[in-house]
Structure formats: structure tokens, C-alpha cells
């Protein structure tokens, strides 16, 4: 007697592409600390332009932008009308916010399961295989997002700003040395640090010649002089 033919059942499955998204925000704070080069006194009334050198970009498939994109202009202030006049002030502040966003899409998968003795069993196995594949594809997309965010955070962990004095207060001059009137500063994310900017002061040279009032000839003997400068706090001339 011939053996009965066993019916075999198969089922195909297909897992569509999965998408994941992610984002983060950074802030960058800059506090100007304006001082005089030699005396270290605080300098009010200096106008400083601060601007991110790069304002937007793309990293690992995601994009970022900083706001405000343009320059911010600040003026130092904070002097107090007391004996600490020269020690207080020289302050100004500005801040920026950065946003990064990325979306990643996985590949697709498909397959076939079987044989099974019933179509119901084959369909159930196909559904299970499809669900497992979808979960893996979701993980694949999310891992890609996580990697992109990590790369972006590393790259944007500090950004450069133009830090430049545009208006010099009366009595001072621009300084072109270290921490001078024109700088490029690197600002770490999520900080609000002080950035020193120095001013030179006006300088002059005085040549004194002692002469005889009658002959007009220069007197060779030593002469002693005292030089005074005006103090804005006391309202008096003070010896230098």
C-alpha cells in the first residue's frame, strides 16, 4: 500500500526598512574679561564682536546649526564708583545654542520558513521570523543614530569663535599680543567661561631740557622732576 503523501507548507516573510531619529543640544557661553595689559585694571566701554566661525554643518548624515548665526556685539561694563573702581567691571557676556539632528534608515530583510504540516503553522513561523527581523533592523537603525550622535558630540565638543574688539575705550589702545584685541577662541560646549582680552594704554614720551633763562644754554647739572596723572576716582592728580 503506498504511503500517504504528506503535504508540506511554506511561508515567506519580509521585514521593511526601519527608521530611527535622535538629536541633542549644546550651549556655548562666553564672558568677556577686559583688562589693561600692565596694571591689570578692568576696562569698561570696550565693544567686542563675538561670532562663531562655522555656523552650520553635517556630521555622519546629520545636520547641525548654531543660533544666533550672526555676530553678537557686547560692551564691557561694571565699574563701581568706589575704591575698587579699577578692580571691578570689564565684563560682558554672550551665548549661543546648537542643535544637531539625525535620522537613519536600516536595510530590509526577507526569507522563507518551512516545511510545516499546516499552513497556519507556516504562517505563524513567518510572522515570528518577520518580527524578529524588524526588531533587529530597529536596533540597526538606532545604533547608527547613536554612533552619529557620539561622533557629532565629539566634533562639536568645542567650537571656534571670532573674538574681536571693534571699539576701543578712551585712554586705551588695541593690543596685538597674546590675549589681545583680535583672537580666535575655542569654546567648550556647555560652559560659560571667562575669556581675557587685554588693552594697551596710551603712551607718550616727554623729553625735558633744563635751560638757563638768560643764555638759553642747556644746564648740565641734574634736575629732579615729579610727574602726576589724573585719577578719575579721587578727582585729583596723583604722583605716578
Protein language model annotation of sequence segments:
Residues 1-240:
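Solvent-exposed loop/turn and edge beta-strand elements of beta-rich ligand-binding domains
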